[in-house]
Amino acid sequence: LLLLLQLSCCFSSGSCGKVLVWPMEFSHWMNMKTILDALVQRGHAVTVLRSSASILVNSNDESGITFETFPTTSTKDEMEAFFMYWLNKLTNDVSKDALWEYFQTWQKFFMEYSDNYENICKDLVLNKKIMAKLQESRFDVVLADPIAPCGELLAELLNRPLVYSVRFTPGYTYEKYSGGLLFPPSYVPVIMSDLSGQMTFMERVKNMLWMLYFDFWFQMLNVKRWDQFCSEVLGRPVTFSELVGKAEIWLIRSYWDLEFPRPLLPNSYFVGGLHCKPAQPLPKEMEEFVQSSGEEGVVVFSLGSMISNLTEERANVIASTLAQLPQKVLWKFDGKKPDNLGTNTQLYKWIPQNDLLGHTVSKAFITHGGANGVFEAIYHGIPMVGLPLFADQHDNLAHMRAKGAAIRLDWKTMSSSDFLNALKTVINDPSYKEKAMTLSRIHHDQPMKPLDQAIFWIEFVMRHKGAKHLRVAAHDLTWFQYHSLDVIGFLLACLTITTYLVIKCWLLVYQNILMTGKKKKRD
């Protein structure tokens, strides 16, 4: 039956294709995996490239996906230690208010991160056996996440069309300089700037500083290393931005329920919340605990997949606060049980977050602001109390706060009373639930489901060998042509010459009139 279903999908879409995937770890992989599972269900052959140092991309997965593992000089433990070190530093050691220190910390992280992925990429593209196998496989499309550089180089080496699945790149630099998207700093907040769509003058100043930081540091320093590396591998001068700009389609994991209005291009599509789905029944014991809450309902608490534990002191403060709530609390927590854990709070190493948020008795969601969790809360219409830690989490919760669906607290400075008051407000003030439901209705009222949209455009690229007709001419222009500096210069030159000629003619006429007048006087 499954085979017949897959064959029917193949016939309806034209043909079954071969998809090569270059993934990113953590929540990025969870989103990518959702797309890949759907492609497999439609009969496509999906091959995922993973290094031997991969953290979450599991080669033992039995979902019908083929995994091609290549050896690398890094180890899984080293990669995990790298991410955990910087996660802890960016979460606990640096304040966003200290801009210069914050910039420097991100700069060091980006440089080390880039070095790690350059080494992994080198281990792949210089592996003749693996590359020969990939060439022979004749893939129809390369699906990649640009936050993990190398997919664009791989697509160029294999001469295959490239499709991106992306949440964001730092400062929107790739989207702007390679994808051609517009991000006017006057009204579009730069990602990681912690700003919303309505900015005061000083917030626009801050937004401009963030944009300049990413434009000049990230663009001028970090990418130049990849320019050299890609040129060496391809044997010809090329820029990394040029390779990124060859992406046929950008599947952006966002939507207007989270974003503020901004310009898009014909080859850019929002597919935010593609992993969201109707709630499924909970495990028996968990359902019993949820039902025991009565009319008060439950609160769901999760800080995502990357935060596995907290300090004992912080865990105890949180536990004592949660114990004061009349609601039952389901807390995703992997650490020592807090000494003052309330009877209303249950700890779990893993929770079916989507199913809990979709439960009829769920009242609020305590979240770190990761895009996956925020979209699940939007999907089910659940208001949030946000504790952002790093990256885009501050932005996501700033947007939700501006839209009236969340209260955001500072993880480092919040007191127990701040936390408790925020929870009581979100649960008891009906405006937060109303705003969350408004966003939920917006999310559901789309002409095509996000996952279906992602699948459609990947299959579209396979059917048509690309999507060149959607590519704006800006990609073929130099920077001075893009900004019409040559046209402005030409028009200024014409104006200058015309002005000069007019003045010259006027002076000649004036002199002739003057000379004629003098001659008449002499006569």
UniProtKB/Swiss-Prot annotation:
PROSITE patterns hit by this protein: UDPGT
Enzyme class: transferase
Keyword ATP-binding: no
Annotated catalysed reactions: glucuronate acceptor + UDP-alpha-D-glucuronate = acceptor beta-D-glucuronoside + UDP + H(+)
Keywords: Endoplasmic reticulum, Glycoprotein, Glycosyltransferase, Membrane, Microsome, Signal, Transferase, Transmembrane, Transmembrane helix
Pfam families, per database record: UDPGT
GO CC term, one of those recorded: endoplasmic reticulum membrane
Glycosylated position list: 309
Subcellular location: Microsome membrane; Endoplasmic reticulum membrane
UniProt modified residues of type N6-succinyllysine: 129
EC number(s) recorded for this UniProt protein: 2.4.1.17
Main subcellular localisation: membrane
Membrane topology: Single-pass membrane protein
Record has NAD as a keyword: no
Gene3D superfamilies listed in its UniProt record: Glycogen Phosphorylase B (3.40.50.2000)
PANTHER family (alphabetical): EG:EG0003.4 PROTEIN-RELATED, UDP-GLUCURONOSYLTRANSFERASE 2B15
Primary role: UDPGT is of major importance in the conjugation and subsequent elimination of potentially toxic xenobiotics and endogenous compounds. Acts on small phenolic agents such as 2-beta-naphthol and 4-methylumbelliferone as well as bulky phenolic compounds like 2-hydroxy- and 4-hydroxybiphenyl. In contrast to 2B13 it is active toward 4-hydroxyesterone.
Protein name (Swiss-Prot/TrEMBL): UDP-glucuronosyltransferase 2B16
